[in-house]
């Protein structure tokens, strides 16, 4: 009898994928004992300015470069925008503490009951801590503190050393 595969999902814009995204993915695989981690890219990212965002297919192609060297890593492009929708069917969902705060904030729902119902659909939640954000109700990932300041925004602004090595522009 084979053991069922333990699958996780890490939703994000990955525009571009950074060294922090890689470290988070690796920490999630370890902490969640995952056999597979899907990086889920929404065609239209919820709450993000899409005017300056690379198309989902371009972002997906970059993330595929990461997956090419990591057999446990896969890429999915989705029309879903809400974490609860993206995480449906997975054993683990990975997110930053800022996103976890948003997921738990009733202001994003029609009612507290709707929020509670959405939270109840989530399986295990692995959260990357960030200063100023509460991580109650989730398991905290151990990610090196020096990566806290890494962002895709900074990478797009010219800090190419923050981009995952496989995804850096050729010089």
Question: Predicted segment positions?
Answer:
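Nucleotidyltransferase catalytic core that binds NTPs
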Residues: 1-171
């Amino acid at each position: 009898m084979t053991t069922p595969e333990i699958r996780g999902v890490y939703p994000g814009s990955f525009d571009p994928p950074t060294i922090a995204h890689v470290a988070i993915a690796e920490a999630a695989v370890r902490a969640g004992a995952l056999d597979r981690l899907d990086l889920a890219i929404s065609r239209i990212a919820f709450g993000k300015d899409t005017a300056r965002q690379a198309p989902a297919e371009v972002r997906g192609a970059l993330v595929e470069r990461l997956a090419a060297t990591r057999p446990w890593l896969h890429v999915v492009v989705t029309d879903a925008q809400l974490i609860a929708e993206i995480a449906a069917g997975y054993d683990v969902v990975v997110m930053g503490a800022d996103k976890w705060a948003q997921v738990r904030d009733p202001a994003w729902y029609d009612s507290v009951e709707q929020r509670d119902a959405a939270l109840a659909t989530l399986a295990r939640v692995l959260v990357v801590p960030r200063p100023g954000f509460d991580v109650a109700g989730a398991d905290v990932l151990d990610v090196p503190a020096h990566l806290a300041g890494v962002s895709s925004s900074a990478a797009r602004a010219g800090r190419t050393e923050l981009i995952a090595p496989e995804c850096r522009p050729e010089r």
